[in-house]
Amino acid sequence: MNKLKNFFKIGFYFANIILITLYLFPGSIFGCFLYDNCYIQPQITKDLFVGDFIISANHVYAFILLTSLGVLSFHNTKKINFLIVYLFLLSIILELFHIIIIDRGFELSDLFGNIVGVILVILIYKIVIRYVKT
């Protein structure tokens, strides 16, 4: 079990580095490689519409992955509450950095996507630890 948990921790730290790099890069790294155009952002799926709100699907997926790796790494430890705060702050701060990064722009749909990705995994985690005995 420790080897699996260590595997998830390495994945979590690696995913943090990748996500922060992708967020702080002026333009789109994926667009540079896939389309030979750093101004085009590839879409995995269409954005999500909830009432009048648009939620960036790419951002939801990225933060679901990051939060899942974090929860798998730190569940049943004292660090889980710190992890939750860290992920919420990271999701907000990274999007706020887009205000000052060249060729990037702050978008509420991206911010909502980040936060929704974190909330979904945390809700599932809280339900599982409450109703499923491990």
Residue ranges and their predicted role:
Residues 1-111, 115, 119-134:
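Bulky hydrophobic segments
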